[in-house]
């Protein structure tokens, strides 16, 4: 199975310049369009390259995003679409940035905070809580919370669950890698997903499935 490699760098550029840009629609070109495309790729709505040209694929992705988020699905990126998209991207960035900030923290069985150290599910629960998202405490319960996501739609910020029954969890970062607090004697670290027995994917933000 090949993982979708997501365009993470685009999300780091979204700021006031993007927020203040004019309407974007089919036929628009330039840096704002490229930024928009990068964020749609990041959120799983666009399976294409970010080339700065607002064509049919970008329009379809925008319509899909709007429809899924209770907006008028006109394919035009105005203030409402831009604001909702920005909020979702910033939320995902917050989750990933928080997770990365604990790289190197020692594993602690039963640990649920930076002060004590984390076990695997204590780590994921704490990271999501910092973004205002409440998830269960233990890995097997986390694996049945949120919304199930197929492997083909895996994106950054998703909870990745391992083994059967589920006994380990982490947070997907993109590019085939995830962050987790692995085991006693180890530390919070980034690991390639291909080395793990992935059995479930759950999503708690900006649900897009099917």
PLM region spans:
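Short glycine/proline-centered loop/turn elements that form peptide/ligand docking sites
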Residues: 75-77, 153-154, 166
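Catalytic cysteine-centered active-site loop
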Residues: 103-156
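Acidic, Ser/Thr/Pro/Gly-enriched interdomain connector segments
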Residues: 1-49, 88-93
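Intrinsically disordered, low-complexity Ser/Thr-rich linker and spacer segments
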Residues: 19-28, 68, 79-104, 204-210
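Short acidic, glycine/serine/threonine-rich helix-capping segments at coil-helix boundaries
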Residues: 23-34, 38-83, 136, 172
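Aromatic- and glycine-rich peptidoglycan recognition patches
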Residues: 133, 139-149, 166, 173-210
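Hydrophobic beta-strand signal
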Residues: 159-161, 179
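Extracytoplasmic/secreted envelope proteins and their assembly/folding machinery
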Residues: 33, 37, 59, 82, ...
């Amino acid at each position: 199975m090949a993982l979708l490699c997501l365009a993470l760098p685009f999300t780091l550029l979204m700021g006031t310049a993007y927020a203040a840009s004019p309407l974007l629609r089919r036929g628009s070109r330039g840096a704002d369009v490229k930024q928009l495309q990068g964020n749609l790729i990041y959120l799983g709505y666009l399976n294409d390259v970010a080339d700065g040209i607002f064509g049919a694929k970008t329009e379809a992705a925008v319509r899909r995003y709007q429809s899924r988020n209770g907006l008028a699905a006109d394919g035009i990126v105005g203030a409402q679409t831009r604001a909702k998209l920005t909020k979702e991207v910033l939320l995902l960035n917050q989750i990933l940035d928080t997770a990365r900030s604990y790289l190197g923290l020692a594993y602690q069985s039963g640990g649920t905070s930076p002060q004590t150290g984390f076990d695997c599910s204590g780590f994921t629960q704490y990271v999501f809580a910092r973004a205002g998202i409440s998830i269960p405490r233990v890995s097997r319960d986390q694996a049945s919370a949120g919304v199930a996501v197929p492997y083909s739609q895996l994106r950054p910020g998703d909870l990745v669950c391992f083994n059967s029954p589920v006994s380990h969890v982490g947070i997907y970062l993109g590019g085939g890698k995830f962050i987790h607090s692995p085991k006693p004697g180890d530390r919070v670290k980034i690991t390639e997903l291909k080395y793990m027995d992935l059995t479930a994917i759950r999503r708690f933000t900006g649900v897009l499935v099917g």
